[in-house]
Amino acid sequence: ASKLSGNSYPSSSAEPVADALVLVDIVPKLSLEGASKVRGFMGSAPDGFASLEEAADAISAYYPDRPRPKDLSGLNKNLRQGDDGRWRWHWDPRWMESPRGNPHLLLDMMDAADWTDRVPTLLVRGMKSDIVDDDGVEDLRRRVPQLEIADIRGAGHMVAGDKNDEFNAAVIEFLTRVMPPAG
């Protein structure tokens, strides 16, 4: 999953912002319904989880069409164990309540950005994502003329975790093409 914030989207710069940009299932114009659903899920355990098993149960309830993994070690990428022994998301859902999480601010920043026509940009989209829909993709395409899109079938918002091989292949192909290795 990705975050898009004021710190990661400078509006203008005399120098190139970056040689390339990869957005992982994030667009400035989010599906508000989907974002609300994700926010509700992420905020449903404000005190964290007593165990990885409890977290896996919550994730399985949110994604009923996915098989519950037998090996829960992958959850270590998304959860952190606190001093109290409870497991909490590494991403703080309160971020969406901050000014930087305001979707209107993100759209305004994109409108003011001057790099969008010169920085090669790839959107890696999970086709089962709750927060990136066709409207958001088309809005981003209008704002970033050279936008490339890698649609990852069967992946939700956590694209890299859902379909890691396809995610890696899309990102590596894009970066190798737009930023070929030297020598």
Language model features: what each stretch is:
Residues 2, 12-53:
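Flexible "cap/lid" loop of the alpha/beta hydrolase fold
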Residues 81-143, 148-151:
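Conserved serine/cysteine hydrolase catalytic core
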Residues 54, 58, 74, 135, ...:
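Alpha-helical elements of Rossmann-like donor-binding domains used by nucleotide-donor carbohydrate transfer enzymes
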Residues 23-26, 128, 152-154:
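Active-site loop/turn elements of alpha/beta-hydrolase fold enzymes
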Residues 145-183:
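Catalytic active-site module of serine/aspartate enzymes centered on a nucleophile-bearing elbow/loop
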Residues 48-107:
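Conserved alpha/beta-hydrolase catalytic His-Asp/Glu region
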Residues 47, 129, 156-159:
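Glycosyltransferase donor-binding loop in the core domain
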Residues 50, 132, 162:
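Residue-level signal for the nucleotide or nucleotide-sugar donor/cofactor binding architecture
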